[in-house]
């Protein structure tokens, strides 16, 4: 008998089958086989093995295979192995029968398990018996195809002298780490890792240390040789099921496995298995196997001695994974208590001619060591992108369960406190070699090991249980705190809030429905397609794209949707320019045509007002309709400048105004307008206004019931890396000051972002507090589209340039899970792109308008003529009476009582001082139904103890607000008016921004902010520059906020002197605001009332007095309130009410503010009839006509001076010195200045120097 083996070994049956198909129909065979099969020449399987039907069995042999042919293990009980599925365990495979050697001139049944059960041959080609023999007679059958190949190769294998090494290896570490790996894969890209993957990779790694195990024996020219292949080609035994249900074994090679990392090894492994099952293996896949892996453990075999085929040096058998036999009857609890783990037996059957027993034994020992090694699993975890440390092999700790109970409780607390440090939240993973870990979160730190995983401990109600296995405790903790969401909440002081969050974070999260997943995908499609479209159509134009952070769109959508679910009234969005156009299009619903028109520069002149602004600063509003509900909600986006975070307090003020208009109160049903604030990571950590605005969150005068903060954390600030941008661990640490929960979310997981967004709204509704969502993502391009970020962050952008977008990765995840088909995904994206293309083409066809210089907005709002601001005397009396209408039993402070009594007296008899004139103005507005809001530092009492708008009970601390009595008329009916007066925090930037926003949100309210001293207004300079002075011109955003800035030179030093008149005058243009420096209480009264009644929405800047508050000359008579109106230019009373002769005047001193009283006093002292003093009460807009009319009354004037306290380069002169001669050349040509010298500081730091300087001004003014 000739039994020379085929170079294809046990794969010979497959070659035969391919050849048969090729002869019948070449197109039925994969083209990769054609070249081989054309030259294929079948040869007889045996000398003479005629079957019962007279046919002869033949086998195939190739002419000259390029490499040694594969020689897989024979199909026997010990060696046949089905390649494990990715999620299978060894014991899950079905048993396989043992093959017997072929015998001469007789045919035996192939020992295939399914063949034995079915009574059929192991191959499709086996002939049936010619006649059915008697029941007790033997049956003969010719072996063909696979069965014949098995028989022949088993016989040939007897020529190989083999020996076998056996080693039992602890499997517990492999089991536990596989659980961690597969759970991670399940949450992310899908798929599973099998034990065979791990063992196979360990074998390849061990071969690198023992390359002799990869050699094979060969005779060359009749001489024995040991052949050392260039690479390790690991042969995998793969069990295939034919169409008739019969199973056959092929052995295909993972080529060059020694050059692969674990991820590449898995990909090659899965490719081989997939192509084997799809019938796509080629001849190349069967050639060159150098060492084989077979896994009979899948049927429970503890260990086997598989046959070694020619061309290989060793075959490794994997046995079943079992507890030691003596413990297989023990309970799980007993096994856990004893620390007993499962074992897996590996065998190394090797060619004893070239490999010795010691080498084989050391080889298995190395595999053993690798499968328990920290470094081995570290490499695997890093390759799979698992950010956590693997389970470590450590000796069991013998401490008592009672002692370990406390350690488990400590571990739970540690995860709640520090779990976020281990969370997988960075989509870039720039430090791919670093595991997310912390010593407090390591079980080893707590004296626990992998042997404790299956032991039960007391957990005191954790996750709804009193006792839990440590494995289950860790599963809950890691799912809650260490996945794609990191949570910080233990800094919150209120136990109820912590408990509420714990229950939701540690509870099982429901997976989104398929419909919800498709909706999330649609939002990502919209976000990405919008940016891609703009990038394609408007190359190089700045738009500050959202690319890399597209998850912002579904996250914002979820916030708004959940607000609608709670039946709230409105969501107001404030955000910087990054991604703003995307938000306008896909969240607010701004028409694409309008956005594209702005890119085209196609502006309609009839709609253009003022200077305008770049497209990524503009605001808009729309209505959001729930996708999975019946509610809708208004959505608005506030305009913003490029000054990052400056919009924060503005938006909060706007929201508070809307809430006050709804007037639902501080109740469960209140705060139905929700602020949604977007931030950048660098700005959130770096801009002080963030902390100022956060500080407003829980204050009575400022709270809005909780803001949802969404940080678009692209891990860079223009070119500044996080290490240079913040000293804290997170950019969000500043938010801990107000006890806000903080969620760090991986931007590559849109489902996690949506879940957190909804939770944030629920928390806000429950506790009326801020919530912070830190969405970690990246910036696909530079700070703008023309920037190259690789110049400063080369490593980061090496990663970003090769990174797939979140839309693509999420789409693949949905397709991989079978939630949607590829066609559905492509159709959805194509539909959205089609919409954009259609609108783009429509915009291109729109009428083009010639670009013209922008027009002033000044003419858009004109003060009505003859506006009456006087009031009836009875109303003044009623306000005076209100100051003494204290509640019964109320104890007024002994120093305040005289003030209240004096006010009642002034209301009836006159000589009204400044503070009371202000309260009279506000009181009349309240009585007329106006909401008046007054705030500032020390505003309720007044910096100079002048206002006392709120009176405090000396004994109980209760409050009494006299003007609130004006909210009802004399008959007790509500007027609709309100008086809201608050002391602000020690802030200017946020406080002024808030009041500006409030005035925008409620145009009908009278909103006033008072500085402690006018000097401190420069702390709010960004708000003044970006909003107050230019908001109307840039965005058409109207405000009539009032700033009260105490101003005046009184020797208190450079920081308690100036409200910086010069700066406001420099900013003034286009009627953008009214700037006034009134000098009488009555004129101040009428100024405020005119501002309230004129219907003009423009800010009012008032420089208010300090020492003049108590100047006995600075008072007003009752009829000045009942008969007069605001007068922008004032003459001396001696000319308007007395007998002063204007014809005697040769010198006019123009001035403003408190210095008027000093000039008058000097004039009277010297009896200077030749000098007249004219006050300009309104500095801007300059009252040109009124000023000219006043000057014309003095026909003999030959000298005109502008007199001011301020230095020459400050105050009104830098503006007036230029504009007055231009505006009224006939009146002001040659006008001269009298002031302090030009100074870099507003004033001298010495009161004595101040007095000398002040005297010099007066001396010069009245010099002969």
Curated annotation (Swiss-Prot):
Cellular-component GO terms for this entry: cytosol; oxoglutarate dehydrogenase complex
Any coiled-coil regions, as ranges: 819-850
Top-level taxon of origin: Bacteria
InterPro entries: 2-oxoacid_DH_actylTfrase (IPR001078), 2-oxogl_dehyd_N (IPR032106), 2oxoglutarate_DH_E1 (IPR011603), CAT-like_dom_sf (IPR023213), DH_E1 (IPR001017), KGD_C_sf (IPR042179), ODO-1/KGD_C (IPR031717), THDP-binding (IPR029061)
Binding site for thiamine diphosphate: 578, 642, 644, 681-683, 714
Comment block on domains: Is a fusion protein with two major domains exhibiting structural features of an E1 and E2 protein, and a short sequence stretch of E1 localized at the N-terminus, which is connected by a linker region to the rest of the protein.
Descriptive protein name: Multifunctional 2-oxoglutarate metabolism enzyme
Organism placement in taxonomy: Bacteria, Bacillati, Actinomycetota, Actinomycetes, Mycobacteriales
Gene name per UniProt: kgd
């Amino acid at each position: 008998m000739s039994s020379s083996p085929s170079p294809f070994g046990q794969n010979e049956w497959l070659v035969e089958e391919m050849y048969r198909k090729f002869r019948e129909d070449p197109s039925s065979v994969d083209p990769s086989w054609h070249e081989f099969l054309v030259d294929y020449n079948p040869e007889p399987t045996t000398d003479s093995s005629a079957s019962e039907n007279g046919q002869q069995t033949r086998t195939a042999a190739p002419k000259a295979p390029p490499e040694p042919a594969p020689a897989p293990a024979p199909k026997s009980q010990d060696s046949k192995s089905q390649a494990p599925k990715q999620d299978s365990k060894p014991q899950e495979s079905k048993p396989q029968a043992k093959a017997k050697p072929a015998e001469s001139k007789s045919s035996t049944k192939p020992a295939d398990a399914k063949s034995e059960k079915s009574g059929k041959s192991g191959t499709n080609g086996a002939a049936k018996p010619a006649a059915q023999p008697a029941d007790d007679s033997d049956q003969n059958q010719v072996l063909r195809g696979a069965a014949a190949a098995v028989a022949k190769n088993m016989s040939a294998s007897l020529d190989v002298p083999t020996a076998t090494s056996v080693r039992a290896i602890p499997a517990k570490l492999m089991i536990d780490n596989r659980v961690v790996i597969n759970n991670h894969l399940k949450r992310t890209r899908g798929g599973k890792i099998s034990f065979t993957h791990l063992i196979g990779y360990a074998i390849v790694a061990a071969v690198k240390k023992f390359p002799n195990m990869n050699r094979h024996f060969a005779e060359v020219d009749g001489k024995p040789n040991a052949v050392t292949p260039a690479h390790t080609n690991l042969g995998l035994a793969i069990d295939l099921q034919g169409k008739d249900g019969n199973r056959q074994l092929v052995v295909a090679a993972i080529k060059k496995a020694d050059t692969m990392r674990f991820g590449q090894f898995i990909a090659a492994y899965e490719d081989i298995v997939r192509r084997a099952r799809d019938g796509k293996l080629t001849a190349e896949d069967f050639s060159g196997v150098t060492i084989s892996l077979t896994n009979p453990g899948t049927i429970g075999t503890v260990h086997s001695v598989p046959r070694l085929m020619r061309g290989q040096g060793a075959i490794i058998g994997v046995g079943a994974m079992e507890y030691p036999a003596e413990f297989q009857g023990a309970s799980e609890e007993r096994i856990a208590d004893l620390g007993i783990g499962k074992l897996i037996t590996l065998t190394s059957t090797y060619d004893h001619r070239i490999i010795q027993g010691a080498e084989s034994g050391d080889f298995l020992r190395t595999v053993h060591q690798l499968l328990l090694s920290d470094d081995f699993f570290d490499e695997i975890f890093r390759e799979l992108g698992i950010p956590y440390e693997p389970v470590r092999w450590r000796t069991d700790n013998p401490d008592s369960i009672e002692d370990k109970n406390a350690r488990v409780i400590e571990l739970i607390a540690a995860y709640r406190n520090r779990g976020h440090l281990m969370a997988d939240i960075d989509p870039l993973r720039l430090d791919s070699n670093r595991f997310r870990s912390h010593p407090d979160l390591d079980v080893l730190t707590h004296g626990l090991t992998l042997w404790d995983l299956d032991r039960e401990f007391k957990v005191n109600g954790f996750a709804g249980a009193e006792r839990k296995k440590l494995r289950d405790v860790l599963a809950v903790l890691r799912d809650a705190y260490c996945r794609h969401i990191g949570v910080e909440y233990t800094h919150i002081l209120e136990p109820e809030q912590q408990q509420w969050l714990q229950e939701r974070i540690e509870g099982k999260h429901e997976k989104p429905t398929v419909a919800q997943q498709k909706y999330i995908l649609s939002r990502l499609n919209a976000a990405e397609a919008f940016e891609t479209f703009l990038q394609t159509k408007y190359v190089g134009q700045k738009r500050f794209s959202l690319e890399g952070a597209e998850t912002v769109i579904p996250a914002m959508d979820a916030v708004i949707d959940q607000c609608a679910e709670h039946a709230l009234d409105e969501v107001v969005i404030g955000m910087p320019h990054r991604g703003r156009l995307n938000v306008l299009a896909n969240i607010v619903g701004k028409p694409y045509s309008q956005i594209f028109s702005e890119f085209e520069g196609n502006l309609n002149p009839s709609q253009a007002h003022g200077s305008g602004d770049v497209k990524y600063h503009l605001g808009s509003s729309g209505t959001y309709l729930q996708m999975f509900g019946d509610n809708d909600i208004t959505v608005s986006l506030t305009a913003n400048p490029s000054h990052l975070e400056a919009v924060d307090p503005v938006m909060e003020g706007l929201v508070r105004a809307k809430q006050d208009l709804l007037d639902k109160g501080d109740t469960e049903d209140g705060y139905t307008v929700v602020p949604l604030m977007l931030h950048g990571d660098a700005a959130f950590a770096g801009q002080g206004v963030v902390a100022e605005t956060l500080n407003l969150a829980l204050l009575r005068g400022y709270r809005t019931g909780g803001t949802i903060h969404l940080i678009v954390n692209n891990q860079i600030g223009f070119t500044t890396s996080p290490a240079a941008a913040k000293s804290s661990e997170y950019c969000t640490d500043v938010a801990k000051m107000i006890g806000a929960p903080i969620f760090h979310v991986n931007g590559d997981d849109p489902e996690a972002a949506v879940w957190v967004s909804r939770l944030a709204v629920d928390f806000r509704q429950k506790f009326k507090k801020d919530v912070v969502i830190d969405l970690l993502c990246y910036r696909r391009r530079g700070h703008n589209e023309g920037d190259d970020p690789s110049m400063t962050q080369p490593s980061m952008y090496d990663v970003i340039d090769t990174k797939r977008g979140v839309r693509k990765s999420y789409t693949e995840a949905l397709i991989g899970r079978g939630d949607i088909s590829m066609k559905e995904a492509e159709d959805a994206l194509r539909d959205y792109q089609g919409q954009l293309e259609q609108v783009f083409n429509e915009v291109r066809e729109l009428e083009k308008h010639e670009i013209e210089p922008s027009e002033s907005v000044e003419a858009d709002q004109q003060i009505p003529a003859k506006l009456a601001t006087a009031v009836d005397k009875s109303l003044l009396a009623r306000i005076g009476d209100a100051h003494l209408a204290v509640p019964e039993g109320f104890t007024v402070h002994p120093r305040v009582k005289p003030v209240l009594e004096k006010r009642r007296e002034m209301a009836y008899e006159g000589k009204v001082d400044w503070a009371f004139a202000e309260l009279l103005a506000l009181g009349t507005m309240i009585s007329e139904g106006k909401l008046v809001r007054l705030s500032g530092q020390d505003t309720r009492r007044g910096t100079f103890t002048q206002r006392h708008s709120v009176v405090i009970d000396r004994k109980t601390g209760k409050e009494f607000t006299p003007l609130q009595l004006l909210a009802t008329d004399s008959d007790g009916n509500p007027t609709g008016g309100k008086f809201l007066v608050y002391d602000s925090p020690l802030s200017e930037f946020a406080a002024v921004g808030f009041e500006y926003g409030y005035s925008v949100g409620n145009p009908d309210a009278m909103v006033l902010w008072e500085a402690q001293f006018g000097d401190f207004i420069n702390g709010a300079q960004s708000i003044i520059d970006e909003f107050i002075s230019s908001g109307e011109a840039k965005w058409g955003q109207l405000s009539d906020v009032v700033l009260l800035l105490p101003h005046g030179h009184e020797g208190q030093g450079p920081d308690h002197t100036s409200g910086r008149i010069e700066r406001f005058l420099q900013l003034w243009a286009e009627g953008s605001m009214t700037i006034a420096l009134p000098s009488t209480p009555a004129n101040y009264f009428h100024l405020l009332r005119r501002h309230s009644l004129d219907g003009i929405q423009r800010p009012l800047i008032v420089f208010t007095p300090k020492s003049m508050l108590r100047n006995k000359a600075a008072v007003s008579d009752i009829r000045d309130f009942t008969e007069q109106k605001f007068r922008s230019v004032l003459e001396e009373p001696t000319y308007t009410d007395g007998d002063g002769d204007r014809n005697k005047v040769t010198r006019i001193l123009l001035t403003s503010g408190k210095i008027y009283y000093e000039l008058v006093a000097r004039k009277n002292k010297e009896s200077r009839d030749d000098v007249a003093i004219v006050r300009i009460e309104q500095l801007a807009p300059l009252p040109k006509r009124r000023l000219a009319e006043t000057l014309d009354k003095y026909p003999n004037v030959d000298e005109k001076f502008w007199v001011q306290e301020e230095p020459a380069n400050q105050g009104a002169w830098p503006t007036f010195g230029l504009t007055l001669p231009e505006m009224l050349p006939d009146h002001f040509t040659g006008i001269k200045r009298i002031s302090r010298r030009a100074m870099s500081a507003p004033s001298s730091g010495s009161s004595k120097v101040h007095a000398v300087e002040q005297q010099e001004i007066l001396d010069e003014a009245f010099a002969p």
